Design a protein with these regions (language model features):
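Conserved structural elements of the adenylate-forming
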Residues: 35-40, 152, 183-204, 212
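Conserved AMP-binding/adenylate-forming core of the ANL superfamily
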Residues: 2-5, 10, 18-63, 67, ...
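Conserved AMP-binding/adenylation subdomain of ANL enzymes
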Residues: 191-208, 215-256, 270
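Conserved pre-ATP/AMP-binding loop-to-beta segment of ANL
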Residues: 2, 17-18, 128-129, 144-145, ...
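ANL superfamily adenylate-forming
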Residues: 26, 111-164
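AMP-binding/adenylate-forming catalytic core of the ANL superfamily
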Residues: 87, 104, 249, 257, ...
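Gly/Ser/Thr-rich phosphate-binding loop
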Residues: 254-259, 268-328, 340, 350
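Conserved AMP-binding A3 loop
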Residues: 30-32, 161, 168-192
Length: 437
């Protein structure tokens, strides 16, 4: 089985060409149309000189062109870099320079915001503009290509061979301090992530998944890959107000919605009409407050709620099944499929139930490390010491930096970030423990 990102679309197009793949502002693209567009973009990118492992950035809101450009870059053998559309020009410039972006896909309005910073990006040679090219700014040494040209049929252009351990994406996260870090994901990381999540969410082709989170966020991008893996439909939204999300859920008969705690808090404060289509909702990116959880369960009594924990370096680590919420409401759950999660002491030995330690993640979802940052990569990505001693090479696991504990049944509980721990009288104490006292 191929674990290549773009082949999620190709396979679904072969099996169900007429099913809707993407919906944006009421305009639909079925899998056959989407697959053809991705192939055309890939061929033209290769013709433009995008080589294997070179980076293509997309600085756009969610729209059809955004998705096609990202998956087209992967199909060309390149590495896609989705840039959060709310970032300021200096932040965009940092990302373009840090990972040596060669090609940028954007709009005229956004391009005009970047006029002063793009000359600072020495590796950038081509800008693809998704709308009118009549009022383009003049920027020396840059080649401007209209989107229609990139999407035009060009015949089959053979690119480099791609394998699933190749880089597929670099996702930038701000982290807690300093400059944003670029997490490098392989094709295998992304595809196995889609398969794993779809397995426990029980996604099917009749699902309609609403994409409200930024595609620069692994949790947001996964809404696309999970949909494409299962031949479901992904509905793109660039909402300004939470109330708009409720209207889209009604209008598009949405069956799956992923969000983060701040958005769930806002949604829980609104008046909802009766919603019958919403089969499940998911939470990640932080703990959902218990009051918000109770309110949402009252608003959506027939909707399954999945509470999840993850971090960009390993995508998703744990989930709490809906039937466990009442039994252990503060738990972040157990390991998702294709993953093992351990709680380890500082010396690398395994903690006993109830004992606090660091969450360590191993398996197919462990990413390739941080782009251009060997020092931080070596701290978080380290050899896993509990493997069979006869193996000649060491497996790399990722140390989360999060303090957790497990119960006797193996369910995990988040305590705090390790950099938030307070040392007193020789002991390390979490802020949560102090608050409880």
């Amino acid at each position: 089985m191929s674990n290549l990102v773009h082949k999620l679309i190709y396979k679904s197009a072969n099996r169900a060409p007429d099913l809707d793949a993407l919906v944006y502002r009421g305009t639909k693209k079925d899998y056959a149309t989407l697959s053809e567009a991705v192939e055309n973009v890939a061929s033209n990118l290769i013709s433009l000189g995008l080589h294997r492992n070179e980076r293509l950035a997309v600085y756009l809101e969610k729209r059809h062109e955004t998705v096609i450009a990202l998956f087209g870059a992967a199909a060309a053998g390149g590495v896609f870099v989705p840039v959060n559309p709310i970032l300021k020009p200096e932040q965009v410039s940092y990302i373009l320079c840090d990972c040596n972006v060669k090609v940028l896909v954007t709009s005229v309005d956004r391009l005009n915001l970047l006029i002063t910073v793009l000359p600072q990006c020495p590796d950038l040679h081509t800008i693809i503009v998704v709308d009118s090219t009549e009022k383009l700014p003049v920027i020396s040494k840059l080649n401007f290509i209209p989107w229609d040209q990139l999407c035009s049929p060009s015949g089959s252009v053979r690119g480099s061979r791609i394998i699933d351990s190749d880089m597929a994406a670099i996702l930038y996260t701000s982290g807690s301090t300093g400059k944003p870090k670029g997490g490098v994901l392989s094709h295998r990381n992304i595809v196995v992530g889609a398969e794993s999540v779809a397995q426990y969410l029980e996604n099917e082709p009749d699902d309609r998944i609403l994409s409200v989170l930024p595609l620069s966020f692994d949790y947001g991008f996964n809404q696309l890959t999970t949909a494409f893996h299962t031949r479901a439909t992904c509905v793109l939204s660039n909402h300004l107000f939470p109330r708009e999300i409720i209207k889209i859920i009604q209008a598009e008969k949405i069956s799956g919605l992923a969000a983060v705690p701040p958005l769930w808090i806002q949604l829980a404060q609104l008046n909802w009409p009766e919603i019958t289509s919403l089969r499940y909702i998911t939470n990640s990116g932080g703990t959902m407050p218990q009051a918000t959880l109770r309110t949402l369960r009252g608003i959506l009594p027939k909707t399954k709620i999945f509470l999840m924990y993850g971090f960009t370096e390993a995508f998703r680590s744990t989930y709490l099944p809906p039937q466990e919420i009442d039994i252990r409401p503060n738990s972040i759950g157990k390991a998702i499929p294709n993953t093992e999660v351990l709680v380890l002491r500082e010396d690398g030995t395994q903690c006993a139930p109830g004992e606090q330690g660091e969450l360590v993640h191993r398996g197919a979802l462990v990413s390739m490390g941080y782009w251009n940052n060997l020092e931080k990569t070596s701290v978080r990505f380290r050899p896993f010491l509990h493997q069979e001693t006869g193996l000649a090479t060491s497996e790399i696991a990722v140390w989360s930096g999060d303090t957790v504990r497990s119960d006797k049944e193996g369910y995990l509980y988040f305590i705090c970030r390790q950099d938030e721990m307070i040392k007193t009288s020789g002991y390390r104490v979490s802020p949560t423990e102090i608050e409880e006292v």
